[in-house]
């Protein structure tokens, strides 16, 4: 249960006092899940969840009015934030920049939920080296009518392609409709090269399973499961492992 002080309500997490607001606010109206329920969930899965978000800059995807309203994507971390939440400055090709939130522990997870986040969306880089990703990400995006079995079959093909090139593929079921596959890589290559590598993976998956998968860029040309390589672009984030997705079911 949250405690109270002269400064308002807070939740004790890992020795940190996390300021919270409106813990009883309903986030998922169909099933009655509240903000406090989400906080408890992320504390319970913190060990696993932090493997995907710790020390990484992340966009705050805020459902300030619950999942029935559109999310607000906030790149800039609030100026007023707890000491246990850091920020890393990302500079974009447009010439703009943003200091994005970086969390390190379970208290940071609770802070993100209190900000209105349902899912967590980190970049594939760590705060100490923003130019070189340490993850290659493959997003399997099913076209309408595609069944789950086909997505899984494509995932196995993608795993084979990655393993043929010396990479270990990890499945991640935190996609809203499809499937994510991650491979950890050395922090040696810039985003451009990592994206090109992911594009090559996608094309090879299509070559090996043309009846199941596509790497076609234009939506009207796609059939089956789209092997989305563009999630490796500099400005892209993907929902992390153990993320709750903002869907009614």
Pin down the residues of each PLM region.
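Active-site loop/lid in soluble adenylation, ligation, and acyl-transfer enzymes
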Residues: 2-131
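Short, conserved secondary-structure transition motifs
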Residues: 68-69, 180-188, 218-234
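Signature for HUH/AEP ssDNA processing cores
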Residues: 101-174, 185-193
